[in-house]
Amino acid sequence: MLKFQETAKCVGRRPTVIPMYPTALIARRYVLQQKLGSGSFGTVYLVSDKKAKPGEELKVLKEISVGELNPNETVQANVEAQLLSRLHHPAIVRFHASFMEQETFCIITEYCEGRDLDYRIQEYKEAGKVFAENQIVEWFIQLLLGVDYMHERRILHRDLKSKNIFLKNNLLKIGDFGVSRLLMGSCELATTLTGTPHYMSPEALKHQGYDAKSDIWSLACILYEMCCLDHAFAGSSFLSVVLNIVEGKTPSLPDRYPRELNTIMERMLNKSPSLRPSAADILKAPYMEEQLQLLMCKYPEMTLEDKNSVCQKEAAHTINAVQKKLHLQTLQALSDTQKTTPRERMWLRKLQAADERARRLKKIAEENYKENDKRMQALRSRNVGSVHAHVLHELDERTLESLPEPQSLPCLDLDELEPSLEDTIVDLGHYEIPEDPLVAEQYYSDVFDSCSEDSEEQEEEMIFSEAGGDTKEEESPSVYRTNQQDSDTAALVGCLEHVLGYTSLDTKTITNAVTDMSPGPMVFNSAVARTKMKRMKESAVQKLGMETFEEVYDYLKRARHQNAREAEIWEHLETVVPRASDCFEVDQLLYFEELLLTMEGKEPSLQNLPCEAAQKKPVKGTHFCDNP
């Protein structure tokens, strides 16, 4: 029987060369080199940074179209940029900048020359080779460190898989935060219909929510894939994969791998989220602590400055960044500002300073008016009901004595006001503008600002704060963030030292003595579900064509309603399309349609969604095999 294989995304595969225009620049500094593929909701390119240091020119540009969004709609891609800008860890893809370019939102990240982990796994599989045990454990530790770093800062990845993990200098880096979101409030769950089925946890498939333990499940699937070069939960169709995950037996590693490593993986694949260990718990296990010590001996001796951990403060920074409503108009205004020359930026700052000065003067005048009016009201209330004139006269004298002497406001001289306006927001310096054009251009470059990534990020943060209505707090240094001269290896050593610092004091074994506190069904967001199903349908139509899609859709719907056998379904699909696996998205679309009807309390059109296992034994707790 034909086995289902996940649709390739091209990321990490052989790059596709796109037409080049050497004179065309993106954001006046990035030159397109190659198209690398497609991410969660954007196209990825390899670019060359003309303003980068020697040896650091190559970077990755993710381009997300926002042309269809209304001006008041929040740009979801900005969430990914905000998250990446707060994450500084050797096991996480480094963020450089983000900006608007016409009708697209662009994110610049570091370039990983080793492509993605899925490409490396397929490469070894085709060559008939397997990864060495020490290499797998080293990569597994790197992923644990990265996931623990994210979870400490209350960030979920939500789409961990081998295609979203990249290699740079043989170090693994977690990327593609396109569907990431924060754990908000006391209910630390986030419902989702996203994710690759091979890596999705049972609670996510049963729509019971997604939390940090769901990332742990996905990480265990990646560990199995590195060891066995195959998916932990396979199947010929979407539903068979789902049933295997929800009701199937927990897979085990081959005997050539340590029993302790297999035990850890099995605990990570526990059907109950509360019984799965966290990334920090796994790093504290005796076997992992031993591997951490061996890994420390492997790397050369390096020294890093000791810094205190500030996880709580960084989590607050990240929550504030994502809670801000950054709209399309704000991003476009930022893009226009970045394209201006230093001279134009100077005049913009002068205008902003003048507006700020005017607002301050207006506020002072209003406060003085209110204070004077209050005093007049007090005088009138004292004089009401006075019978004798001499009493009124005495009250007036006492009141005048108690009042402070009036202070006159000086007249504003425009000649004196102009220089004060310039100093209100930004200090432009006490230099005269040179008359020579070349010297003047250098003056503008030195005094005002430059077009470097640092200056652009500072201006971006200023606009973010204006749009969000709050000010940016001073960031504290992180234990994982190192100086620019420190390599990823040096930063990784710092992470290992940090982990070993507390594992030696707090070592414990992963146990099953945890009470099962599985969460119940969560609130269903039908609008989000319909949007994702619409995109899923568009992708299937683009792949199969409208006529073929309708034929496959109608057949699968009838076949599922009649409880047809999987073998019969796939045999018929092979007569309609060249590869039956191309119909996976149609099958997935039908599943989500029935799930949506069930969650909305409507009668599903498919009374019994078919699968051979479901005919023998209904799956408890799932919406696709039990009638509502």
UniProtKB/Swiss-Prot annotation:
Activity regulation info: Autorepressed by intramolecular binding of the C-terminus which dissociates following phosphorylation by NEK2. Activated in response to DNA damage. Inhibited by zinc.
GO cellular component: nucleolus; nucleoplasm
Biased composition (Acidic residues): 452-463
Region (Disordered): 452-475
Active site: 159
Alphabetized UniProt keyword annotations: ATP-binding, Cell cycle, Coiled coil, Kinase, Magnesium, Manganese, Metal-binding, Nucleotide-binding, Nucleus, Phosphoprotein, Serine/threonine-protein kinase, Transferase
List of residues that carry Phosphoserine: 274
Protein kinase domain boundaries: 30-288
Coiled-coil zones: 347-385
InterPro entries recorded: Kinase-like_dom_sf (IPR011009), NEK_Ser/Thr_kinase_NIMA (IPR051131), Prot_kinase_dom (IPR000719), Ser/Thr_kinase_AS (IPR008271)
Gene3D superfamilies, A to Z: Phosphorylase Kinase, domain 1, Transferase(Phosphotransferase) domain 1
Top-rank taxon, per record: Eukaryota
MF terms in GO: ATP binding; metal ion binding; protein serine kinase activity; protein serine/threonine kinase activity
GO terms under biological process: intracellular signal transduction; mitotic intra-S DNA damage checkpoint signaling; protein phosphorylation; regulation of mitotic cell cycle phase transition
Biological function: Protein kinase which plays an important role in the G2/M checkpoint response to DNA damage. Controls degradation of CDC25A by directly phosphorylating it on residues whose phosphorylation is required for BTRC-mediated polyubiquitination and degradation.
Family note: Belongs to the protein kinase superfamily. NEK Ser/Thr protein kinase family. NIMA subfamily.
The protein, known as: Serine/threonine-protein kinase Nek11
Species this protein is from: Mus musculus
